[in-house]
């Protein structure tokens, strides 16, 4: 066995249907007393209801979290945090809300409690992606990692089926890239395979019966594992392309992951098929084409064109993605990446 380093994320995980009733207890356990509740505008009502349940432990609600964590929104949130005299944040929602909580923590050292309502997985990573002037950058550090994550499947029962599918594929992208990361290790790989297995088991069940609590629990379990391995190893081509297109073209985050994943995995698979063999075994056939077929069965968006990307955008995106690429086991060449984007734009089966 080759030598390796595995760094575990020092977060407290509270998992179980109905567990979100313990938010107040978690705030007190941290020795805190003034929580600013965060959400997107869409989940403002849920955030206000949570703040009402917290009573005097709630310092207020900030409900303007947005995709790709725009720096201008973060500045307003930090002002609200300080004006409210808050001493922690409670992030209720998906990756956008979690990202805002991380951005506030980075600037104020605020402890974070996250209650995920999607399968994004970012709640267990020490990674923050934020956007300024149309450019998305990524930061990593222990101060970004939330202190407590509460997984309650009841809070995902209202997640629309379409978003559930793309959010789940987003989580799977984290685990898929962990299998061939430069700093991969057997512990992270084991968690990645289990996370992928859980998502592949759960998502068809969620699609067929959105109120199936058992399937929702399995999906949350898979999302936790997939997100955890993203925090334990480095990112590669897939996340680079998603960050480039998402930040530059303001594309929906999970949907971008869902569309690109089969193509990026097929690209890398040509260089390291053995490392992606566990994923190939789970989806059947080859990893890239198997993911393409799996996403199609879930009814996920099939092309970049369906997300609003124009053919005229592809040259610039290929240029940006290859100007400062993440490490990748297969050389990242502009011509090859442009061809990858073309197939993803058309929704053609990966090569």
Curated annotation (Swiss-Prot):
Pathway(s) where this gene product acts: Aromatic compound metabolism
Domain of life of the organism encoding this protein: Bacteria
Enzyme Commission number(s): 1.3.1.32
Signal sequence, start to end: none
Reactions accelerated catalytically: 3-oxoadipate + NAD(+) = maleylacetate + NADH + H(+)
SUPFAM superfamilies per the UniProt record, alphabetical: Dehydroquinate synthase-like
One Pfam family here: Fe-ADH
Keywords for the protein's UniProt record, in alphabetical order: NAD, Oxidoreductase
Assembly information from the UniProt record: Homodimer.
Function of the protein: Involved in the gamma-resorcylate (2,6-dihydroxybenzoate) catabolism. Catalyzes the reduction of maleylacetate to 3-oxoadipate.
Name of the protein described by the UniProt record: Maleylacetate reductase
Gene of this entry: graC
